[in-house]
Structures are given as structure tokens and as C-alpha cells.
């Protein structure tokens, strides 16, 4: 009975495979939105105000960061929790594949979230005259919470590594 339960639990990791595949569909949706934004801006490039162009560019940067985060979570999560990726040697391979454990993934995700939050905060500040002060305050508080969380996670990981 114990062996059956252990085998069933170990096999259940494959339930995550469709989740990681779903993230690739989310990446496709993000790519469609990215190019939709570019197609929307290009015809108006000579008429658009500089501030509006910068806001659009920040949105594109934000989408690129989210896309990178999706790729990182997809591949690392799959490799850490489901199965090792078997990519032939003749294909281009990401240098970090197979080298990112759950601790380093957590740190990279936290850093990505801080970067994404920074872009959002910059977009909000560029349009600060149209944003109520209390909302600005909450944006800053939330961003600082992300920064503090990433710092604490990194510090705790460093303490854990130093004890080994």
C-alpha cells in the first residue's frame, strides 16, 4: 500500500505538465497583445505625443519582462518539478536550463516582479497628474513591499547558503 501511494504521488507531478503548457499559451496571448500594441502605435507615430509614446514603450517593456518571467517559470518549473527537458545538442539551448533550482528560481521571480512593478510605477508617475494621491501612495507602498520581500528572500537564502 505504501509503495502504491508513493508511486501515485510521484506520478502526480505530471499533473503540472498541462499547467506549464498553459503558460506557453499565456505567452502566446501576451505576444499577440504586444504586436497589437505595436500595430496600434505605428500608424500614429508622427501624431502621438512624446509622453504617450514613452508610456506605450513602457507597456511594451512591461510585456517583455512578463514574457521573460513566463519562460523562466515554465522551463524551470517543468525541470524542477516534472521532468528534465531533453533538448538535443544540435539545438540552441538556454544557458541556465538545468542549472536553476527552486531557490534561484524564487530569487529570479522576485527580481522580475520588482522590475515589472518598477515599470508600472514609472508609468503611473508619468501620468501622476491624473492619478489621485492616495492611489499613488498605495502604488508606492505595494512596490516597496515587493522590494522588501525580494530583499528578505535573498537575505534568507544567503543565510541558508552560509550555514551549509
Swiss-Prot record:
Main subcellular location: membrane
Record's bilayer topology term: Multi-pass membrane protein
Top-level taxonomic group: Bacteria
GO cellular component, one term: plasma membrane
Keywords: Cell membrane, Membrane, Transmembrane, Transmembrane helix
Keyword Transmembrane: yes
Spans through the membrane: 15-35, 53-73, 136-156
One family name in Pfam for this protein: UPF0114
Record InterPro entries: UPF0114, UPF0114_bac
UniProt-annotated location(s): Cell membrane
Similarity comment text for this entry: Belongs to the UPF0114 family.
NCBIfam families from the UniProt entry: HI0507 (TIGR00645)
PANTHER family in alphabetical order: UPF0114 PROTEIN YQHA
This protein's name: UPF0114 protein Spro_2386
Amino acid at each position: 500500500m505504501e509503495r502504491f501511494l508513493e508511486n501515485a504521488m510521484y506520478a502526480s507531478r505530471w499533473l503540472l505538465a498541462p499547467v506549464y503548457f498553459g503558460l506557453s499559451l499565456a505567452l502566446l496571448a501576451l505576444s499577440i497583445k504586444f504586436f497589437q500594441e505595436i500595430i496600434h502605435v505605428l500608424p500614429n507615430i508622427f501624431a502621438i505625443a512624446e509622453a504617450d509614446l514613452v508610456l506605450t514603450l513602457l507597456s511594451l517593456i512591461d510585456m517583455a519582462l512578463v514574457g521573460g518571467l513566463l519562460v523562466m517559470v515554465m522551463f524551470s518549473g517543468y525541470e524542477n518539478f516534472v521532468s528534465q527537458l531533453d533538448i538535443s545538442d544540435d539545438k540552441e539551448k538556454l544557458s541556465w536550463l538545468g542549472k536553476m533550482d527552486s531557490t534561484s528560481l524564487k530569487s529570479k521571480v522576485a527580481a522580475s516582479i520588482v522590475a515589472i512593478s518598477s515599470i508600472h510605477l514609472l508609468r503611473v508617475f508619468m501620468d501622476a497628474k491624473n492619478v489621485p494621491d492616495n492611489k499613488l501612495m498605495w502604488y508606492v507602498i505595494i512596490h516597496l513591499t515587493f522590494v522588501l520581500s525580494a530583499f528578505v528572500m535573498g537575505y534568507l537564502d544567503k543565510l541558508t547558503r552560509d550555514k551549509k
